[in-house]
Amino acid sequence: MPYVDRQNRICGFLDIEDNENSGKFLRRYFILDTQANCLLWYMDNPQNLAVGAGAVGSLQLTYISKVSIATPKQKPKTPFCFVINALSQRYFLQANDQKDLKDWVEALNQASKITVPKAGTVPLATEVLKNLTAPPTLEKKPQVAYKTEIIGGVVVQTPISQNGGDGQEGCEPGTHAFLRRSQSYIPTSGCRPSTGPPLIKSGYCVKQGNVRKSWKRRFFALDDFTICYFKCEQDREPLRTIPLKDVLKTHECLVKSGDLLMRDNLFEIITTSRTFYVQADSPEDMHSWIEGIGAAVQALKCHPREPSFSRSISLTRPGSSTLTSAPNSILSRRRPPAEEKRGLCKAPSVASSWQPWTPVPQAEEKPLSVEHAPEDSLFMPNPGESTATGVLASSRVRHRSEPQHPKEKPFVFNLDDENIRTSDV
């Protein structure tokens, strides 16, 4: 979508055919400067390029004879395509959509319209002479190939010396792949599978770094709970995730200073810990991001809810209620079969059965002997049995504040007693 910048120039992204009838389109950033009487295109937005990086192509507006929509016969497989006729040469360009196509055609026709000067104006001849001598120098710029590197977070372009035409052909596919990857209007449904909530909005924006304050192009994705940005559209793991519950305000950045002063379509996302400065490609894109983030934050405040995957995480969290609700069933599953069978056959006498807590006896109290013990004491475990069943009843051992006294008789039961049970023998 073309927009007007601070210098009253029409700017925007278009795809231009590399060579006529080649069918190979490259992504470029176009600037229609009516004051300089030329149409320039760059590798990217000049604000994002290194200092001194010039245009990769240019065309004088006085050489343009006609701008029209390409017919299906000219470009049958290229939608939203229009052609610029200039100096017996045709430039085929592809827009993003139908409205973008119409706006560019009208702007170029309006800028290249021939105006008849008033009588007695001599500077027109000198202007024409300047225009005639300028194109040869401008046309030499696209012949220079650059190698783009990121050194210390700064984009550096180094000219490459070429021996013949093979070097240019070899480096063009890499540049072409990089440019196609930076498109902001390609849908994301086919590249990265959505594992979380559905996306509300996604696209490329330019973000300011936190440490070096450098500007880098990142792929942003907004859903119902977070806003994430990735290094490229194909990445699965985001570089950073901003929870919407931490977003305090999102609005257009009107008060600018320093590096922010030259940034168009700039908005800021204010959170509790940091302010993010993000630059969109057009004013419409900027307002769309602001409205989308604001609506998502408002919806989260009015109807607070958790992501759908939080329930599955809480099930595996240690110490959760689902694990502690049935400790006996989990422990019983982990017992060996032999020990479990032994515990079942001696259920009346094992220490794992429920017993109330016994308080600490006073110093003057005399401990009960085995002969005078009450009848319930017969169900207490023997000294030998307490060690055998200690593994099973480690979590439910009855509290004893005083060690047991040694027994006079090794066998506490009377075999002549008629009330003795066979399970205790």
From Swiss-Prot:
It comes from the Eukaryota. GO terms for molecular function: fibronectin binding; laminin binding; lipid binding; PDZ domain binding; phosphatidylinositol-3,4-bisphosphate binding. Residues 7-113, 198-298 form the PH domain. One of its GO terms (biological process) is positive regulation of cell-matrix adhesion. InterPro entries: PH-like_dom_sf (IPR011993), PH_domain (IPR001849), PI-Interact_SigTrans_Reg (IPR051707). It is a peripheral membrane protein. There is a cross-link at K141 (Glycyl lysine isopeptide (Lys-Gly) (interchain with G-Cter in SUMO2)). Residues 310-331 have a biased composition (Polar residues). Pfam families: PH (PF00169). The keyword Cytoplasm applies. Binds MPDZ and PTPN13. This is Pleckstrin homology domain-containing family A member 2. GO terms for cellular component: cytoplasm; nucleus; plasma membrane; protein-containing complex. The modification Phosphoserine is found at S184, S314, S349. It is found in: Cytoplasm; Cell membrane; Nucleus. Residues 310-425 are annotated as: Disordered. Keywords: Cell membrane, Cytoplasm, Isopeptide bond, Lipid-binding, Membrane, Nucleus, Phosphoprotein, Repeat, Ubl conjugation. Binds specifically to phosphatidylinositol 3,4-diphosphate (PtdIns3,4P2), but not to other phosphoinositides. May recruit other proteins to the plasma membrane. Residues 363-375, 400-410 have a biased composition (Basic and acidic residues).
